[in-house]
């Protein structure tokens, strides 16, 4: 995929990812976090990691298998998002809250990955052919 395609894909992919992940975070992040914070997390966490997944990693893995790229991207995104969430809001509510929040972030990422794979299988946006 050429760089222009990656940039063209970025805003639509971001909106799609936010549309999938934010409801998961709203429902499954600890109720200790206000609704505004849970919605903010859906927008902010993806805004922090999505450019790396879409713009930085593909050129780095251009000569590698897609599986290797996916392993790197889908490990980086939830790990970085858990770290960011913890640094911003962690420690409030105890270990049980933190584990639940991490599970919500990982689950949201897993769901958006699976939804993206389904759309990719159908040639969404013409970028995955």
Functional labels for PLM-detected ranges:
Residues 5-18, 66-78:
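Structural signature of hydrophobic alpha-helical transmembrane segments
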Residues 115-129:
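Juxtamembrane boundary at the C-terminal end of a transmembrane helix
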Residues 1-8, 128-129:
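Short, strongly hydrophobic alpha-helical membrane anchors
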Residues 63-64, 83-104:
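Membrane-helix boundary connector in multi-pass membrane proteins
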Residues 49-50, 70-89:
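Hydrophobic alpha-helical membrane segments
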Residues 27-40, 90-100:
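Membrane-interface helix-boundary motifs at transmembrane edges
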Residues 14-30, 81:
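N-terminal signal-anchor/start-transfer transmembrane helix
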Residues 41-60:
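A generic, lipid-embedded transmembrane alpha helix
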């Amino acid at each position: 995929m050429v760089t222009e395609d990656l940039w063209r894909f970025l805003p639509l992919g971001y909106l799609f990812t936010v549309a999938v992940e934010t409801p998961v975070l709203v429902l499954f992040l600890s109720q200790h976090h206000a609704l505004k914070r849970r919605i903010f997390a859906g927008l902010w966490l993806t805004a922090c990691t999505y450019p790396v997944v879409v713009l930085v990693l593909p050129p780095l893995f251009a000569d590698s298998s897609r599986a290797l790229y996916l392993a790197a991207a889908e490990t980086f995104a939830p790990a970085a998002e858990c770290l960011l969430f913890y640094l911003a809001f962690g420690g409030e509510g105890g270990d049980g809250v933190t584990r639940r929040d991490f599970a919500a972030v990982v689950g949201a990422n897993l769901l958006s990955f699976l939804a993206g794979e389904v759309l990719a299988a159908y040639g969404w946006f013409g970028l995955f052919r």
